[in-house]
Amino acid sequence: MLQPRSLPALQSALASAGLDGWLLYDFHGLNPVAVGMLELPGMTTRRFFVYIPRSGQPVAITHAIEQGPWLGWPTSWRKEKYSSWRSLESLLAGLVSGKRVAMEYSPGDAVPYLDRVPAGVIEMVRAAGATVVTSADLDSAFYAVWSDDQRASHERASRAVSTIGQEAIRLAGSRADSAAPLTEHALQKWIKERFESGGLETDHGPIVAIGPNAANPHYEPTAESSATINRGDILLVDLWAREKNGVFADQTWMGSLGAPSERDNTIWLAVRDARDAAISLLRERLNARKPVRGGEVDDAARDVITKRGYGEYFIHRTGH
């Protein structure tokens, strides 16, 4: 969150990156980074910009009719008002002309999650005389971070999700030889009930899939279309949940209901080794205090899978 106490670290990062400033923009919640950094109360329905310079105080450009959300803006920081597109563009040019600024923009839409500012707004900022670059590293350092409470909540959710996922596979295995084996949908329902009884919430899912269904990363069983889970099946359980207002934990568990075949073992070892390669790269870089990017970690895992002959089937990304 942008506050006076967080400003020095942010401005130090701007200086290290060779940037003149970070320009936040939002309209009707289009840009979650701007929304999260500012945490304005109430609803905003007009365009606004917030310019965080490498030195000096931040400046907000706000609409004249929408001042309520800005009542908590520090009095030592500037706040300008506009009431027409001409006054907006004039104020913007006064702030960023000749400057190299970061925005929530990803060249070529390389990282869609970061590409939040509309192309027309980028054009407006460039027409104001600024050079626009991506704010990706700033977003990672100052927005996409957890508080201590969020981390603790995530870890609690992660432990619960892990327990429920493994129990689900054991339950399916114990029922596979009975007169009433579970269906994918029945096991999905059981997991949802465990979430609810444990004080967890989810948006949809989980994915419970056997055989060919497990090859569909977004498969979800329904009451009308659901396979029966039998002995000898490979079962996938992909589940995610969080505490109320907490941080999601997302895990995938797979198990063989019975002795796995040689082919099953071969594929499992490839996936395990790919996971270990990714974790090894992370540990190596972090222990050496060297930067590491998600794409590098993905490459480390993907290289193992490809060399084992399964690259064309690795259709999902790594990272969650």
Predicted ranges, named:
Residues 1-319:
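Active-site neighborhoods and metal-handling regions in enzymes and metal-associated proteins
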